[in-house]
Each structure stands twice: as structure tokens, then as C-alpha cells.
């Protein structure tokens, strides 16, 4: 026990050592996040730049586990970049730093009141810093500043919107009053008629009493029929246990007993708020829920999975959270302490979200979707926070935290267009590459609550990322809530507030009164509530298949989604076989379906990507005259990067506009699927246009990628000036498997489902001819695939990493051991069969040379040996060239960084070289950054070409090597 305690302290101290421990003085110092050349010690860099005329820079600390990324600071009065902190982020060096600033000359003068002389001084200082620091190993530079990150809370209505709503309400009241007046008039007529009938009855009563009675009854029936003809047809009424009091408090025993009649008895859960949790099991409207109770009956409850709720804190002492709280994965980054407990009554958001995921089954409030999973709290929303601290937060304990649930982002005001800083991007890349022991963390982001403002989640750099699963909201009636944002990045939707129903469950305890009873809440909502429900569903899937990668989870979410409101015109057929809608993504999450699909899922192949040349357009977009531009992708382009099928598409745009909200951008793929990349936003009056903005879409999933990709830009403002400067197409997808890679163009779709055809083995048909009726027919054994998976789903491959590493290979069939109901792994069975078949004969390690059956083995061995020899020679040559390139001191080379963004520069992707556009596949040791930016091809204020990455073309390699040799000679002369 003591050893475990000491080990825990050591691990905790190591984690804490990566956190900043002192308050920053932003008033007197400038703080920057630097990425340095691979292997360069930050102390060495600090010493090398201290003697330069750029201020006294001090190394502060590394940024978590992000490779080669560090925080430095300097006094503001000596730092040439002091006033960048209050302006647009500066994210690049290596020859393009000053160029970006030069493009902002007019903006700097007008927006920030800088004189022309001050701008010139700034540019000169930046030019010198850019050249000097890049020469000493700087890869990128980002000036850090504190900012507020916004919860996905309901958006307040504007005065204009309130007036509009009042007008709608007034008209509705007038219509209701008119209907009531009509009803009153009809009632008066009915009363008069009845009075006359009664008088007539009374006069004839003695003569025809019996007949009068019958006549009176018939007249009454006629009156009722007349009323029915005028009345509106009755609408079906849904059964509800209660009305106004439905969300007013805890139910009494009688109501609870009534509800129990409609709830599965086998579940056996008695948490008092369970009857309100309609999204877990809806007795009001069958099927309008997560379909999760059947999984609970199978004991699929999230055991072994940890979800980190990145939010405004977590009340770990709440009765519904305490037993499932995971302290090791928790930290308060706002106040730099291990306890993320809220300190304000306003910080309830994270606790409510955590309860949706993992509220304990304990007769308190309700239960979470995955009520046996663990939940951690990472606090970042309670006050302003710098970008590097945010990066630390989303990387915190990424080997222990599996899922990060994020219900926050830029303001949902229909005006903001914001993306995370470079250091945050790098943290996300680090998490999906190295988190969960290399399988990648799963990021779940709420789409946003700005729907009523016309906001769109493609203008949010978090939801617009290929690394995120973007989740929108669905209301009680399976409708689209007014607040939930639509966009082409929406993957799925799930339930939240709407139609007078809410998400209920856990709440924070009283802040000041520790003796208070546990508190439950009845009105959680927005996309803030949808994302945690999705995270809980993903926790269930990971509990049955912990080997799933971050990309596998996206596949599972897509292929298990249930289409809703199928008659809506917004649905489009896609290559995936699933239909897509910008409001609903691929449909609503179904917990049972995603778990069932996960249990038989074969891991996808590694990621690859194709990146087109930057297409320069430089054309004005006239009012109501759409501008079209086409980029054509050929089969040869895709074969070069070992491309099989598409997953995410990004289009990186540079566009100028006098009224950004009046611009609409569409992307039409080869199969005719249309992604609305940029929607109209009435409140977005910005004149900044799009500055290297990467719009992302999941609507083209499973597309082959080959063909014309047509971009359409529309200008809907009659007086507006719009110009499309340039754009670039990026297609991310799955690699072909090994067999297809070696026999390119020969494999048929059906061959992809056969695991027996490994490299060097015989074809199944030849093997069957020779084996005859033997029991060990490997091809037949391995053909079984889940029926609900896409028809071209690949076979098991090494676990997904953006980079290929030899150690990944043995983990290519982890799913078998997780499924006791299935057969054991085929290979051991085959070995036992073959040994039993040959028990009567002489057993030898070597096959009989005279046997035709084994002759192919020797040929295969020779081929493999030759292949290894060729690879070895190639590796030696490549290593020698890489070493020569790494000697360049003007900027880090392509081989210097673990994560190469676009190989035309080190980090910010501002320059794109036309001759280096057919980018690399996942086989290479680089990962493309989907936040990538492109730059027009002008050369103003360009400092040095050596600051860019080495190209793949031979002439460029020779040039870089010669220049590196020359610099080394110059350096020796200076030192001598």
C-alpha cells in the first residue's frame, strides 16, 4: 500500500511539474509560445537569442507534452512584438512573419491607431526577429493573451428579435380572440335555438308528449352535428403523467408508481428523477430516446471508461457524482489546483454535464447514460485563460482520460469567426496522435446555440475541426430546436431541451452550506446538454471495444445514426449509404446500435490525405451572380497518397468582403453532394472576409474523391464588394490496405473483406483447389463481417495513428478477444488443425522441397528478402539526405518536426509551393493539420526561402543541401 501511495505521489508530481505555478504579469511582460526545431533544448535557444537586440527572453516552461513547444517571456519595453498581444494572433516565423504584418499595414493604421512610422518600425523589428530567430531554430511563434471561453448557454434575444416575437404573439392572441368570439356567437345562437325549441315543446307537450320528446332528442343531435362540422379536427394528445408540475420538483410516490408501469421492470433503477429522464427511456413518445436501457440489462454501463468534462468545474462531492469521480484526470486550470470544485453559484454547468454522462445509480436524482463510467473535471471556463493553458487542459492526463466533453467555444452571436491558436491546434494533434496509448482521445464538441441568430458551426474553429465529433441538439419531438446551429461539420444530433422539455439530473451542492441536502436540477438544455449525452454513448461503445481509435468512433457515430424527419428536403444521399442533413448531421445517436456495431467493428486503416494546389481566382463576385471555381482530383493524384475513400473535406479560402455575413459558399462533390460551407449570417457585418479559413465538411464521407470539386461563392448584398482570392481543397481519408497498395488497381471491392489474402500468400481460389476438402479453409473463416457495416468496410488493420510506426502492427485484431460469443482467433485454430491432420506423418520445421504445395513459400521468402533489402538501401539514402537537410539553420527542415503541417512551411502554412502540392499519405511520418492556412503567391517582404520546409522534388533537395553547406562554411569562418 505504501509503495502505491509513493508511486501515486511521484506520478502526480510529474503531472504537476508540467503546469505553470506562478501568476503571469501581462501588464509588464509579453508571453509567447514557441515551437523549436526537433531536439533543440529551450535553454540553448534562450542563450542563443539573449545576445540579440530583441529583448531579454526567459524560458518559462514546456507546454505539457506537446513536442518541442515552450513558453518564453520578455519585458514589454524591450520586446519588438509587445503590441501584437492586443491584435490578431501571430502564429508563424521562418520567413513569413513580417510578410503577414505587411498585409495588415492598413488595418494596423486604422483599427489600432498606429502611425505609418510606427508600422514601419514594427515591420523592421519583426523582419530582424524573424530572420534571427528562425536561423537559431524557431519554428513558430504565437503571442499569448488571456481570453474568455464561452459556455454553450442559451443566447439572449436582441431587442429586435423580442419585438418580432411580441408581434408574433400579438397576432396569435388576435387570432385566438377571433376564434373565441366566433365560438361565443355560435354558443349564443345555439342557446336561442334551444329556447325556441323548449317553448315549442312546452306548447305541444300535452298533445304529443312522446313525439315531442323524440323530436327534442333528434333536434339536440342535429345541433351537436352542426357544432362538429364547424369545429377544428381533434389533434392526437400524447399521454403525460403530469402537466405543469412535471418539472416542478421531485415526484410523490403515487406519480412514481404510475410512471413505473411504463418503465422496464428489469432495469431496477429507483433514482427518483429517472421518471423525468425521458431521453433515456421515453414513455410519452416511443422511440424518442437514446435506446439505452437494453444495454443496461446487458451490463453495458460504461465500466472502465473515463470522460473528462472540460468546463467550469465539477462538484465531486455531489452525491450523484462522488462514487464516479476520477481525481487523477481532474485539474483546475483557472486557479491552478487539483480540486476543480466550483467556487461560485454560477459554475453549475460542468457538474450538470458530468451528471448526464456518469451520474451514479444510487437513488439520488437521476442516472447517467454510462452510470458505471468515471468522470473527471477540468476547469477552464471560470475566468479568462491563455491559449497555452487551454492546450494543457485538453492534453491533461490524456492516457487516463479517454473522452473530452467540451460544451463551449466562441460566442454564439452570429458575428464571431474564431479558431483556436496554434498551440491549441498542436495540443489537439498531440491528443489524437498520442492519447489513450496511441489510439487517440475522442473530442466531443457542442455545435453551438446561435441558431436563432443565424449562426453556423463552420465559423467555430473547434467544431469545424476534423478531430472533433460535432454534436447538435434534438428536441422531445425529434425536431430541430431553434438554438441548435446547422453546418456541414455536424456529425450527429442527440436530445436536449425543446418542446417544453429539458435535461434533468445532477446539480452542484450549496456552495456555502455543506450540510444541505443533495440538489437536483430540472432545466438543463442547449447543445451544452447534447454533447455530454453523446459522450456518454461513446463511453458505452469504448467499454465494449477499448481498442477503438478516434477515427473509428467517428465511423461508428456516422454508420449507427438514425435518420429522423425523413421528409425534410434537406436530406441528401451520400456515398456512405447514410443520408446527410446540415441540421441533423447523419441522424440521431442510438446507443444500442452504436454498441452493437462496435462489437463487430474492424478497425479502419491509417489516415491519409490529398492536398491540391492553391487555386488563384482573384475575381469579383457580383450581386446575385454566383462565381464558380473547380478543382479536379484525378485517380493518379489519389494513388500517390495511397488513398482509398474520403472522410473529412476542407476547403481553405481567402476571400475579401465588405459585409461578410452576406456571403454564401457551397462545395459540390463529384457525387453531387452539396456542402454549405458558409451560411448567410445577418449580424456578421465584418469587413475582414475569410483569412485562410478552413471550412470542414463530413457530408462527403466514403466518397472516392476522384472528379470535379466545384466551389460556388454567392454575394447577396447589392452594395457589397466580394472577391474570391484563392482556395485549396484538402481531402482526408482512409488508406488502402497493404494488399491494395502492392497490387494497385487489381483488387476488387469484394476482396477487401478477405483477410486471408495477405502479401505473399496464394489467392483463395488457388488455395481451395490444392486444399480440397480440408477443414482449415482460412479464406472462408475470415469472411464474416457485420451486416450493418458499409459494404466496402476494410478488414482489421493496425490501430489508427496519423503516423505509421512498427510497433502498431501487432495490434491489428484486438476485437476478437473482446467478444466471447464469437470464435477464437483463426490463426491458433488453423495451427491446431494442421497439426492434427499431420499427426501420423513426420513433423518437420521445414516443408518438403518436393512438395508443390510449399514451393510458393520459398519464392515468397525471396521476394520479401529482396523487398527488405531495397527498403534498407532506400532508408540509408533517405537518412543521408535528411541529415544534410537538417543542417540548415535558417528554419527547421521537414524532418525536424514530429507534426509537419503542410510541407510548404513549418507551422502556419502560409506559403504553398505549386510544385509540392500532391501531399503525403499516412505512410509518411507526418500529419497534416486541418486548420491549415494557405497564402497567395506574392513575394512582398519575403525574407528567405530557406525558412521553408524542404520539398520532395530533387532539384529543391540539391539546392537546400548546397545552401546548408555554404552556411556551415560561413559559420566556421565566423567562429574561426
From Swiss-Prot:
Family assignment from sequence similarity: Belongs to the peptidase S8 family. Furin subfamily.
Domain P/Homo B: 604-737
Keywords attached to this entry: Calcium, Glycoprotein, Hydrolase, Membrane, Protease, Serine protease, Signal, Transmembrane, Transmembrane helix, Zymogen
Topological relation to the membrane, as annotated: Multi-pass membrane protein
Localization in the cell: Membrane
Matches recorded under PANTHER family: NEUROENDOCRINE CONVERTASE 1 (PTHR42884:SF14), PROPROTEIN CONVERTASE SUBTILISIN/KEXIN-RELATED (PTHR42884)
EC number in record: 3.4.21.-
Biological process annotations from GO: peptide pheromone maturation; protein processing
Renumbered residue ranges of the record's region Disordered: 172-246, 733-848, 914-976
Protein name stated in the entry: Dibasic-processing endoprotease
Glycosylated sites: 156, 291, 299, 336, 606, 886
Main location (coarse class): membrane
Domain Peptidase S8: 277-595
Annotated transmembrane regions: 524-544, 855-875
Biased composition regions of type Acidic residues, renumbered to the chain: 213-231
Organism: Yarrowia lipolytica (strain CLIB 122 / E 150)
Chain's gene name: XPR6
